[in-house]
């Protein structure tokens, strides 16, 4: 015993010295970092304490019990002998409810374990009404802290004791030693079962034991502390057994009113010196004051916690127990004035029923919910429950109808399905800085990949279509397959990527619905459908059969709607997920693949967008397949399109990794029941009215008119409403619609677009005047006519538009109004030239993407090949680009730089290069898909961060100690920087991430957590006043910095060559489209009023068929050649002098501007750009759109000569 006291005194002296030197108590890490002599003392202290406890109760009980027996206080008028607990109470029965109070548990504990050592009567019980328990479990414990010993262990093995003089050894010590010998001779298993039954009340899972200490469950007096058991002056086991459960009440306690949930901080351990110091605050310690420290675990030693017991009792879980947080606070209020908390009566389980006292009348006093307020509250509760159905989240505050452990409404806390290990983890640890999201149902562990449903034959052939496929076909509402559907479905079910080209209305959607249904039947999985338009997604979701559950994710959804959809996806309640390419590629669209069910296959609807829309319009299409393979682990793709030439099909097949097959195409691109006609009228508006009033179109009740510009849709719709309302006579089988014509374009709000489309689908609208945004995915079979006011941009667009008519097989009419002088062709050329750029702008972009660095580290060749700037297999490119890439696909040099994360602010880059954002992103995608893999394009992010501290520089420096990114940012600033002593700091997020080597999301999360802190006593989350702002959206990429000048020139040539090739192809496509329609056009619409011309219609269908069947390399060039100018253009020689004069005048009017030759040509053609917008330069009609009839490239040449002349 002397050795134990000596070791304890030496450890206390070391801890006091540590506290004086460091200003804080030593932690577990400090003990581990202490000298070997100190650590040896801690180990010896632990060993001596364990040996003493096993020998018969320890030093505390062997010395204090004789003093309690021999030095009993004399009876006085007032004293502890008058307490109610001093009277003998009947012993509790073994079958007492678990919901007894803490004193009741102490009574049973003493009766079983220390029955022979009792020095006083047992404690009595007093009925006490139960209060409401805490409705929120504690937060998870951070890593690195050891488990906290349970209260049952402390009471049973090492009971604490009040400071008292050490008595002399007496007879009671010998009785205790003999008792330990007798207990040692018994069966250990029987003893363990006896011990485990007694602390069963506290051995339940922590999540099922609400914290003791709420205002509703304790009787507290301000300024005093409450202890369970006898008074502070009593001696014996009663005082020692419950000394640790005293509660400090001097500070405000957390309340449960107003939706606030109680939380408590925990102390991981307390050293002997800490307990002695806290217990001696009320007065000078006595001789045995250090005895309390013997029972505490030394810092640095792990404590073994009891395994949690399952909460199997079906009774109400809101009983009063002792939580770990209450144990951590035990002993901190020792020495303060006592306030008794009386034991409480166990509550019988009545389920959800509450007994009402009907004998006493109660009246409402004060504010109450009556009439209007009561109805408003009921209305809020109703819509809160419906929030999930409309995309919103559930109630923000846990209500009494839900489980207070996981806030679910399908069970109570007693039947909570959460595992015991998770409950124990959630009940320990500090409050997180950022509130955690609402718990979602856990997805069962699934395989990362989905195996094909059917295997291939020995020679790679498809298996015969089994019966279950036809059964699923009937379940979807179809009796048989249409041409091309069965083979495509079997290929997907066999795991083979497929490109399916079918006419519009031929049932392409079934080819992904049927495989998705069969895959989901076998195992929980997900089918991704990438769709280009929101209206198309809405139409497809509404048209799905009931057996398929579908959901959408797009940019028009709110955050609550997106979270609701993601929660259903994680719970495997969605079979088909439709999303836009921007939602798939962009940041925040989908969670990581590990949090989602495995993807069976991915369907690219309107797959021709991969080839046509991906360049300078929607560059995300260029990265769709790459993201699906690398991020989502997709191996099987299905491409669906109705308009794809051989060239387009080959390009799409390359993206989808589909082997080329001779039967990629289905039937003819234009159905036989469509009657085509073309006319060239000078007054298009009057010709349209004449055609609609003619015999051929007069009785048609569903017509779609397509225009190239939004302004034309509004104007033509107003014209038709004025002129055709009284002239139109409905057909024999239909009734007159409510409205004659309405406009539809992308500039309208979504509600208005849905209204127009719904009216047209229901037959209440006869004519829709729209742009190409209308009709994609339209499922109305009886569209009788499709008209075009102007030249379509391509054959593919025309075929797709006319394919929306006559899907029911009945005759339908299609007419095209062509401008005789090629005015519409000029407008389409403007869009082509708007996407082109100069070589100088490309070179500036390359310099910004590949800045020089000073990397000196090398990497092994195996890592270099897969990193940025390494090599990878060369994909197949079109013939025009294959020759250009052939000399660039040679193996590059070994890279020294492994790549740096860089950010290009979008707005600044757009202004510096005078290029649209889509054009810049397209060039970056070209570099990412290059065989040399020049860079890795990441999701766009906000790069500029500003952090403002209201507490001044002192608070900023204090935050740097807890936030490593902020510390690195302050360390990188120059000492002479005047902002060093300010209360705010601004920095580049991406540069900071690149210098630290962290992930961008981790740095952003660490900076956002600086805005929140915890109240040190209650753990309630509170704001710190720190403001963290992110701004300046930027392209985020990773590129090497050690490229040579030759490599940069090679990249510039590659990018500029791709831009010129795309421009030539687009101009050639326009030229060929105009020539084809011009060859079959009538001079006016007169011959088309009564009946169609079958001969010209057949000729046009043959031209379209040959265009779609052409092989690669047969497409002619599109730039001006020696034969003459393009259609619709004048000769430059006739206008050269006037053009030069106008260029000089334009430059002289704006001498402060630094124009390029392309900028001057754009203004003369009426093409706006970021640096020269149409809103500013379009006001000067002397130059804007003046030379639209001349060649754009000819204007660029003349402007270059004049700029050089001015520079001289």
From Swiss-Prot:
Localization (cell): Cytoplasm; Nucleus
Record note on quaternary structure: Interacts with UBR1 and UBR2. Interacts with MCM10; this interaction regulates RECQL4 unwinding activity. Interacts (via residues 1-54) with TOPBP1.
Broadest EC class assigned to this enzyme: isomerase
The protein's Enzyme Commission number: 5.6.2.4
Textual note on the cofactor: Binds a Zn(2+) ion per subunit.
Disorder this protein is connected to according to its UniProt record: RAPADILINO syndrome: Disease characterized by radial and patellar aplasia or hypoplasia. Baller-Gerold syndrome: An autosomal recessive syndrome characterized by short stature, craniosynostosis, absent or hypoplastic radii, short and curved ulna, fused carpal bones and absent carpals, metacarpals and phalanges. Some patients manifest poikiloderma. Cases reported as Baller-Gerold syndrome have phenotypic overlap with several other disorders, including Saethre-Chotzen syndrome.
Taxonomic superkingdom: Eukaryota
Entry function: An ATP-dependent DNA helicase which unwinds dsDNA with a 3'-overhang in a 3'-5' direction. Does not unwind more than 18 bp of dsDNA. May modulate chromosome segregation. The N-terminal domain (residues 1-54) binds DNA Y-shaped DNA better than ss- or dsDNA. The core helicase domain binds ssDNA.
Domain Helicase ATP-binding: 489-662
The protein's name: ATP-dependent DNA helicase Q4
Gene name as annotated: RECQL4
Consequence of substituting residue 508 to A: No helicase activity (in a fragment of residues 427-1208)
Record's keyword annotation contains Electron transport: no
